[in-house]
Amino acid sequence: MEKSQSSPTKDASTKQKNVDDWLPITSSRNAKWWYSAFHNVTAMVGAGVLSLPYAMSNLGWGPGVTIMIMSWLITFYTLWQMVQMHEMVPGKRFDRYHELGQHAFGEKLGLWIVVPQQLIVEVGVDIVYMVTGGKSLKKIHDLLCTDCKNIRTTYWIMIFASIHFVLAHLPNFNSISIVSLAAAVMSLSYSTIAWATSVKKGVHPNVDYSSRASTTSGNVFNFLNALGDVAFAYAGHNVVLEIQATIPSTPEKPSKIAMWKGVVVAYIVVAICYFPVAFVCYYIFGNSVDDNILMTLEKPIWLIAIANAFVVVHVIGSYQIYAMPVFDMLETFLVKKMMFAPSFKLRFITRTLYVAFTMFVAICIPFFGGLLGFFGGFAFAPTTYYLPCIMWLCIKKPKKYGLSWCINWFCIVVGVILTILAPIGGLRTIIISAKNYEFFS
C-alpha cells in the first residue's frame, strides 16, 4: 500500500526533473564565474551605450553627469540585491525573476507583477536590437559601397534576423557562451572606438552645449526621453537570476560567490564603456550628436565600418541573452500548462515564431531613439531600479528609517519617477519620427 502511494509522487518528481533538464534556464548548471561576467556585460552594455552622448545632449552637463553616476550606483546596488536573494531560502534556488516575485508577493500576484514587465523588457530589447543590427549592417554597406544601389532598411533587418533563425535553436545559456563572449569583447571594442575616434577628431568647431530644441516643450520632452535612454542602458537585471541559475551551488560554496565576482567585473567594464562614451563624445560634439554616436562619426570610413561590424556581433549575442528567458517562459507554459511533450519540434516552432515576430515589429517601427526612451522608462525602470528594492523590503523587512530602509526607498522613488516620465518623451519621439516614415521603406 505504501509503495503504491509513493509511486505517483516519485513519477511526478521524475517527470518534473525531466522537464527542468529540458528547459533552457535549468538544463545546465556548470557555468564558471567568468561566464556570468561576460553574460552580464553582453546583457548590460548594449545598443544603449551608443545613445548616451545623445542623452547627455538632452540632459545637459549637470543633470547628465548626476543621472549617469546615480544610475550606475543604484543599479549596482539592486543587482547585488538580486544576487543575494537567489538562494535566500535554504535548499531552494529562485532561478527566474518571476519565481523571486512569487516568493515576495505571493504565487499569483508575483506572476502578475513580474512576468508582464519582464516580457516587455526582453521582447522590447530584442526588437530594438533587430533595429540596431539592421541599421548597422546598412551603415557598413553605405560606407564601403558608396556607388551601390540603396537597399532598404527593411531588407537589412531581415538579413540580421536570418542569423537568429539559426542561433535561436541553441538549447540553453551555456550553449551560447562563445557567442556571448564574442559579444562582450565587441561591446568594449566599439565603445572604445566611439570615444577614441571622437578624441582624435578634436572638439567640434562651434560646439554648442545649449538645449537641442527651440521650444520649452521640446526641451522638456527631450529631457524625459533622455531619462529613458539612460534607464535602457542599465537593463541586465532582467536576466541576472537566469544567468545565476547556470552556476553550480553547494552549501559550502553558494552560487552568489561566483556570481558576484562576475557582476563586479561586468560593472567595471560597464563603467569603462559608458562614462567615456557619454562624457567624451558629448564634450566633442555637443548638441549636434546623433541618437547613435556611430552615425555621427563618419570618418575614417574603415574604422567606423569596423565599429558597426562590432555592434552587429554584439547585438547578435545580446539578442540571444534576452531571448533565452522568453524561450524558457514560452516552453514552460506549453509543456507544464498546455501539456505538450518536450521535443525539438515544439522548440523549433516556438523559437522560429518568436524571431519572426520581433523581426516584423522592428521592420514596422525602426525608431532607435524613441524605442530606447519608451521601453527604458516603461519597463526597464521598474525591473531594474525599484522592483528588487520592493522585494528586499518585503522579504528582509529592514528596520524602519534605518540605512537599508532609506536606501531602498530612495531607489524606489527614483525608479517610479523614471517610470512615469520617461515613456512620455519616448512616445513623443516615436510619433514625430513616424510622421515622415513609410512602412517597409
Curated annotation (Swiss-Prot):
Keyword Membrane in record: yes
Record's signal peptide: none
Keywords: Amino-acid transport, Cell membrane, Membrane, Transmembrane, Transmembrane helix, Transport
One Pfam family it belongs to: Aa_trans
Extracellular side: 54-58, 132-155, 198-222, 286-300, 371-373, 428-441
Subcellular location(s) per record: Cell membrane
Residue ranges crossing the lipid bilayer per the database entry: 33-53, 59-79, 111-131, 156-176, 177-197, 223-243, 265-285, 301-321, 348-370, 374-396, 407-427
InterPro entries in the record: AA_transpt_TM (IPR013057)
Membrane topology: Multi-pass membrane protein
GO biological process assignments: amino acid transport
Primary subcellular site in the record, as a coarse category: membrane
GO cellular component, one term: plasma membrane
Membrane side Cytoplasmic: residue ranges: 1-32, 80-110, 244-264, 322-347, 397-406
Keyword Transmembrane tagged: yes
Family indicated by similarity: Belongs to the amino acid/polyamine transporter 2 family. Amino acid/auxin permease (AAAP) (TC 2.A.18.2) subfamily.
Primary role: Amino acid transporter.
Protein name from the UniProt record: Lysine histidine transporter-like 2
Species of the source: Arabidopsis thaliana (Mouse-ear cress)
Biological classification of the source: Eukaryota, Viridiplantae, Streptophyta, Embryophyta, Tracheophyta
